[in-house]
Amino acid sequence: MSPTHQIQDPKHWNRIADSDYLWRSLSLQRWDCSNFTNQHLGTHTWKQFFLHQRRKELQLALAQPHNFVYKVTKNIAFETELAYLSGNRLTVDEQEKSIICSVSPKQELCAWDVQEGTMIWSSPVQEFHFSNLVTLPQMHLAITMDRKKTIKVWNCQDRDALAVLPMPQPCYCMEAYLTKDGPFLMVGDAAGDIYTFTLPGLRDISKVTAFQYGIVLLHCSPDKKWVFACGTYSRTLPQVFLTESLLRPSEGSAPLSTFLPHKLCASACWTPKVKNRITLMSQSSTGKKTEFITFDITTKKTGGQTVIQAYEIASFQVAAHLKCPIWMGASDGYMIVFTSGPYLLLFSITGFLLQRFEDHQAAINNFWVDPCYVLTTSENSVHVYMWEEGGRHPYLRSCCHLENTWHDHTTDSCISSVMCDNASIVLTVTKVSDSSILVMYSLNT
């Protein structure tokens, strides 16, 4: 058959439309599933995987309050954030549960079945308070740091930790991630050092002195190629490291890195869809001036050596009449979302206002963003937004508003953390005169 006849043949297009290459490419564009293998797929195809994920996303986006059931659990500590232990976001298993990790007032690490609202595992009571909690859902691992400067790795099944490692300095930030070479943990400490360890064994791989002051921000890029680090001292310049040089350090030579030429960095986020793009939020010491600066990070061969280069591609200042942003997020590489008082604002990276949402009456007091969803909270309500696929208008869709049906009006409280996966929304409500409660919403399927 000639090429012309092949193009006209419906069977030819059907083969293309069902090809694993096409559907895997579409999946990689939308989700961080580079480590998702044919073994994870089992008997399913990449087309089935893609359509299954999109169906789950839309179920949450299209849900209304009556589509949710909620469970309330009391006596949750408020020192650390929540973290999902389950990999519900990327799975072909219809029966997989949403599992969330939290810390009890007795300093136990706890795992909760969100759909059932029940605790399914807890660690022994710890002598020292937890100060940090991260998870690696792909490996079903939780990693904690306590106030004695000890890192522990848990599988949330066995009673005791899989690995324990005392650190020389307090650690302000941790990042767990999975690469083609395996799972790793990156830690930034109060002395300005970045440590890299294997997981779950916590074997030391490298130690890099990045700053003369403590590190408060440590973020891996979506493709795990870059690591952003920022110190506590606002006059120091943030740095971006090549992850490969931290995982495979060369004796006698410093890891590849570059400074981003903007001080006063208050926050930063990588762009899920343009994986080498990062946006910084810079704020003056008075908090009256906020600027967003976007960089593209690349490597270049110069004289036989590889160097990292950061290109500033866009920037803008937030108008003086807007309340100073606290949180920010990004999606397709060309838009920035942030809060200002009761408003959620979506700007282009060049400073053009694209959308303004007014779904809360009072100031937004918490914010969470990932490649699919944006969550905001105010007083005792949660609002759900969803990114439109492909950056189409409307770029961010307002979806669902959950009021405080679980709230005890006799006590003062506020939502201190919120997050979601494709099947659930969880939040911590901190009470002034009591310990926090955990509220777990799940779709009533």
Give short role names for the model-derived ranges.
Residues 2-121, 140, 152, 294-315, ...:
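Intrinsically disordered, low-complexity acidic/Ser/Thr/Pro-rich linker and tail segments
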Residues 382-389, 394, 409-445:
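Blade-level signature of beta-propeller repeat domains, shared across WD40, Kelch, NHL, RCC1
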Residues 84-97, 133-140, 174-183, 211-213, ...:
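Loop/turn segments within WD40 beta-propeller blades
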Residues 34, 57-78, 118-131, 159-177, ...:
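Inter-blade linker and blade-boundary elements of WD-repeat/beta-propeller domains
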Residues 6, 91-93, 99-104, 141-146, ...:
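Conserved beta-strand element within WD40/beta-propeller blades
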Residues 109-113, 151-156, 194-198, 230, ...:
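WD40-repeat beta-propellers
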Residues 2-5, 116-136, 143, 147-152, ...:
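Internal alpha-helical scaffold/solenoid segments in large eukaryotic proteins
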Residues 11, 106-109, 148-151, 191-194, ...:
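Loop/turn residues immediately N-terminal
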